[in-house]
């Protein structure tokens, strides 16, 4: 009985630390795009701009920008105001000092989209430091639409 209780406590402790980051860069990116479904539920309306989501997914230097941006003409993470995503391809481009660069490619309504996620391994797991599209970065995009 004590072993079972110890196992449950260990699992719960692991879950609480995973709530503020992710175990791998690939897991982080997969979890971002899990929010981009067919909008049939609240979990498929795009990545929410609330404080809890910001804490889980973003580096502290990007959290305020994520939660305070309003009036964006499109969702930066899918490069469109609407989405119907095909398969998401994820690969590690390079690891450089404290940052890891993750290439992401997918089709959105039949249009090819490529993004580079720059992720860092924080105290609670992997989080997004920035995201680059061929023409812009998430940090610059959010600065344009800050509330």
Question: Could you say what each language-model-derived stretch is?
Answer:
Residues 5-14:
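Bacterial N-terminal signal peptides
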Residues 95-99, 109-112, 130-147:
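Low-complexity, intrinsically disordered terminal/linker segments enriched in charged
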Residues 23-41:
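Short, aromatic-enriched amphipathic alpha-helices that serve as compact interaction elements
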Residues 40-50:
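Surface-exposed patches in mature extracellular/periplasmic domains of secreted proteins
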Residues 115-120:
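Hydrophobic/aromatic beta-strand elements that line small-molecule binding cavities or substrate pockets
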Residues 23, 55-111:
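Surface-exposed, charged secondary-structure patches
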Residues 18-21:
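Boundary at the C-terminal end of the N-terminal hydrophobic targeting segment
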């Amino acid at each position: 009985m004590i072993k079972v209780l110890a196992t449950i406590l260990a699992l719960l402790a692991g879950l609480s630390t995973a709530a503020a980051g992710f175990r791998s860069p690939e897991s982080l990116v997969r979890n971002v795009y899990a929010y981009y479904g067919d909008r049939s539920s609240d979990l498929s309306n795009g990545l929410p701009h609330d404080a809890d989501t910001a804490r889980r997914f973003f580096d502290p230097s990007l959290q305020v920008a994520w939660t305070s941006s309003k009036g964006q003409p499109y969702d930066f993470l899918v490069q469109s105001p609407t989405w119907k995503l095909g398969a998401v391809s994820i690969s590690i481009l390079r690891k450089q000092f404290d940052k890891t660069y993750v290439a992401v490619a997918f089709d959105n309504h039949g249009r090819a989209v490529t993004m580079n996620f720059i992720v860092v391994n924080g105290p609670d797991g992997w989080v997004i430091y920035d995201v680059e599209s061929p023409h812009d970065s998430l940090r610059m995009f959010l600065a344009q639409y800050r509330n």
